[in-house]
């Protein structure tokens, strides 16, 4: 284990011996590392067989957290590892794509679409990523896919 990863685990109150387990604050290291954009830690945790289906207190998975961080390396590592790209959180029903579209993260939207994110999923309030697109570029990206039927 690299010293910077050991330090990160210790500084965030995770077990060095069992690095994929939650800390005392009920936070999963994969979620926090993704949220912080720590691709090195995310890759390490994935190598340690971190569960891909863990969620935070709001029901968001690690992919959502990586999208929040706007970190394409974390997003790519999680998608490559097989994270559920279309996971819908329990609170709003939003997916990572819906979140990214609604917050103007254009690069993230492009990356998720290239990986096959479902554009037809809806929030509990019946909104799709297209409905919530925050920028013209995102609107164009999503509307081209919806019109083509992909």
What is the predicted role of each segment?
Residues 1-36, 40-43, 47, 147-150:
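Intrinsically disordered, low-complexity regulatory segments in ankyrin-centric signaling systems
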Residues 26, 59, 92-93, 126:
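Start-of-repeat signature of ankyrin repeats
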Residues 22-23, 56, 89-90, 123:
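Ankyrin repeat boundary/linker residues
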Residues 20, 45, 78, 112, ...:
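Conserved hydrophobic site in ankyrin repeats
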Residues 1-11, 115, 124-127, 131-150:
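Ankyrin-repeat-protein effector appendages
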Residues 16-19, 52, 85, 119:
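Ankyrin-repeat inter-repeat connecting loop/turn
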